[in-house]
Design a protein with these regions (language model features):
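Carboxylate-rich, polar loop motifs that coordinate divalent cations or form catalytic acidic clusters
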Residues: 1-173
Length: 173
């Protein structure tokens, strides 16, 4: 009986202390110097975090924050890192950010580069990478851009598109 009490005591006292809560850090807008609303998040291959923020794309390297505002000061709704590029979607525009020779992120509009005609008031909420294709989803269309061939496709929907999903190489919406 004493052995049973000791065993129970040991398990309750010591095993209860082995579970730790993972560290959670909260960053208020005053720390990262941008708006308080973030719409999306992605992580690049070099482990930097990127956030779609009301004032641009936020970059966090684990210790420092840097804001990359859009040229037209529009809200960034979506962000997706892929290789050396960080794709973003905003108000009537989508494109990518890439580092120049000085290490600064520079924005390139794919709407301008490909000569894409977007709808009035269109915003881009989700970005997916599928093989050589980059997909930008608004509430009524999905724009597909092939990075190798530079071909574009537009999928229109009579219903609102709330999100897109990649399941084993097949896109669902």
């Amino acid at each position: 009986m004493r052995l049973l009490k000791f065993t129970l005591f040991f398990h309750i006292v010591f095993l209860g202390h082995t579970q730790e809560h993972p560290p959670v850090m909260t960053f208020p807008p005053e720390i990262y110097n941008a708006a308080n609303q973030n719409w999306g998040i992605t992580q690049s291959d070099d482990l930097k975090m990127y956030f779609a923020n009301n004032t641009g794309v936020l970059e966090f390297n684990g210790s420092k924050w840097k804001l990359h505002p859009t040229d037209d000061s529009s809200i960034v709704r979506s962000v997706k890192a892929d290789g050396s590029k960080v794709y973003s979607g905003s108000y009537m525009d989508f494109g990518y950010w890439e580092r120049n020779q000085y290490g600064d992120l520079i924005y390139q509009s794919l709407v301008e580069e490909y000569g894409i005609s977007v709808l009035e008031e269109e915003q881009f909420w989700t970005i997916k990478v599928l093989d050589d294709w980059i997909l930008f989803q608004s509430l009524s269309r999905i724009y597909m851009l092939n990075r190798d061939t530079k071909k574009t496709r537009v999928i229109e929907s009579k219903d609102e598109i709330w999100n897109i999903f990649n399941v084993e190489g097949i896109i669902y919406f």
